[in-house]
Amino acid sequence: VDYWESNYESKGDYIPRADLGGPEAFKKGVAAVHARGGKIILYLEAFIVTRKNPVGLEHPDWAMMDENGSFYTYYGRDRFYLMYPGEGSGWTEYVCGLAEKMVRDYGVDGFHLDSYGCQWDWKDYNPKHPGATDPAKFNKGAVDLVKTMRERIRKVNPDAVVILECCERTELLDVCDGGQLDAAAWLYSPIKVLNEKPWVKEKKY
């Protein structure tokens, strides 16, 4: 069930749907799952927002641009912004604050950050983001985003977790609670895909 306003593709503010009872019903649903011994891990986009979502409308200045000064598209579609996590952008503060608020207000147990385990080496040409053409700036910002989110939600709930979709970068794995193989891996051989990761032989995780 898509439980955010206004639909699945509206990524950015994550407001529980009014026709399903709104925030209060969502909170009660989480409590009911907890009463049965379950946990609620929310899907959250840390990389993209919908351009027509209130967050996208208000803060295109947080998004990354290509070398021609145009906003990056996402798989060829221009309905999303790709958000920059470094200096000059308020994205990290916003999304980490949002995660903290959802743990506090709804009692959720953590977040699954879609695709964030493989977002790496982006070059950003947005002039509002100093030095962002250096991919190292994005990389540091991505690590800081995951680390900050985990620290903030654990101040509210010490057992809260941050899980990443994809598990390509040890720098990101070092600051989260777990990684999920990318969805495509399940179409053929998850074990083969896992064993191809450069860090598997180190037996670090």
Question: Residues of each region from the PLM?
Answer:
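A cross-family glycoside hydrolase active-site/sugar-binding cleft signature
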Residues: 1-2, 41-45, 112-114, 163-165
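Catalytic domains of carbohydrate-active enzymes, especially glycoside hydrolases
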Residues: 1-6, 105-109
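Active-site neighborhood of glycoside hydrolase catalytic domains
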Residues: 82-181, 186-204
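Short amphipathic alpha-helical segments, especially helix-boundary/capping motifs
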Residues: 4-7, 71-76, 122-128
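Active-site-adjacent "subsite" loops/lids of carbohydrate-active enzymes
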Residues: 17, 24-27, 31-32, 39-106, ...
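Short, solvent-exposed loop/turn and secondary-structure capping segments
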Residues: 10, 51-55, 122-124
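Aromatic-lined substrate-binding rim segments of carbohydrate-active enzymes
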Residues: 6-41, 130-131, 135, 139
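Active-site-proximal loop/turn and secondary-structure-junction residues that shape catalytic pockets
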Residues: 4-7, 46-50, 117, 166-170
